[in-house]
Every structure is written in structure tokens, then in C-alpha cells.
Amino acid sequence: MTRLGFSSSGSATSTLNLKQALWQTLRRVKWRVDSVLDKCGYTLQKKVEGFSFFSQLLNERIKTSTEIVFVQIGANDGTSFDPLYPLIKKSPRQFRGLVVEPLKDKFELLKRAYADIESVIPVNMAVHNTEKEMMIHRVRPDLEKRLGPWARGIGSFDSEHYKLSYLHNSLMVTERVICTTFDALLAAHNISNIELLITDTEGYDFEILRNIDLAKHRPVYIHFEHGLPVGLMSWEQYKDLIRYMTQHGYNISHESHDATAFLPQALQL
């Protein structure tokens, strides 16, 4: 867990720890506000001329596209803090793809969210580069409502991930999930020519994205969670991933907790 104060390792480390602790505190405040707003049917979003850069890109694409083929890894319940769901509900005929969620209770909610959209297929699996099964560490389902909407979205392969939210381990349980690789997922559902890829896996985004052959798969848009302020992805991992993406022709738009990689053609479509 992040600690405040100075240590013998030097002021740079102490400053980083302080920034991480402050960011985590602000994140928890936002989660509390989100909880209150969620009960009233509202959602809190950072305002950047009304939309995030990612949303702006997709809104422009929707105006000219007849079909956006997509894969969303870590879809959760389909609606909570989801950048894609509002766009699909607004223009359902223009999206075709997979929403992937390994946790059983979240998957049932995900199926319900997309029940009226035949072109969106919910998949009850996790994406992992090597393993057929993994344990996901998550908040106890009976406590999620009490803790607030933020608690729905912190399930992770990482057994220490919950500490970023200052939770006690007594609030956590593990759930065994079935895994598949990215390529096997696409093959199983006959998905090719992906235009949009979204990952939100609470700490495994780097491993998934770095393992994708971007010479073979060329999503025009890749939206992912880096979580640098709280350590979901290390700075070295982030730099390596950005280098890999830029070497394959992608531009990068960096936001506080997420990033969007996009091919130059995204601005011409």
C-alpha cells in the first residue's frame, strides 16, 4: 500500500508515493460522489468540450460508418463507467462485436444490457496470454452495493490490486474464471478486421496489448486503461507499449487514467 512521508530512498520516490496517495484519495472521493449520483440516475464525467477525445473520435466515425467491428475486453456489467455503451445504445445498427466479461454475476448483467442488440455478443471468459484458467480477486458480491458503484469494477488477476482502493482483504473473495487468448477469441467468433479495441482489465492491459500482433491486427482505435497515477501500469511498461504502438503507425492521446491509440486514418474517416 502507498505510504505518505519521506524515506531513505530519496525525495523522488517520496514525491511519487505522495502523488499516488493523493490521486487515490481523489479517486475515492469521486467514487463516493459517483455512488450518490448513481442512485439518482446520473453519471459524473470529466468535461472536455462535452466529450473525451475517444468519444469525439467515435462520434465522428458513427456519422460515416455503416458498421464498426469491435472487441471490448473487461466489459463488466455493460453500463458502469463504460465509454462504449451509450454510443452503442444510440446507434445499435452501426456496431458489431464482442463484449467480454469473466465474472459470472457481471456477465448476467452484461447479457441483460445488450439483450436487445443481436449484433453485440457477450462472452463469459477472460483474456489471458498463456493460462486456461485464472483466479480473479474481487470485492465480495454482497458488499458491492454497500461500498458503491466503484466496487463493481476492481476485479483483477493481481491479488494485491485491492490495496489501491484501501480495502481490507476481508472484503475480498476469489473467483475462478475460464481464459482464452486474444487470437483464439477472435477465431472462435469469426471476428476479423477489428476497427475498435477496448481493454479495461484492472492491471492486465499491458500484457494483452503488448502480445497482440499489430502487423496482423490493425484496429483503427485502441482505447485502454494505463492507470499510471495508481500504478496499474508501470511507467516502463507504458513507455514500452507506446513505443510498440507508434512503431506500428499509431498516434497516442493520453488522458489521466486512460489512453487512446489511433491510426492516422481515424482523422480522415
Question: What do these predicted regions represent?
Answer:
Residues T2-L269:
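Phosphate/nucleotide-binding beta-alpha loop and adjacent structural elements of enzyme active sites
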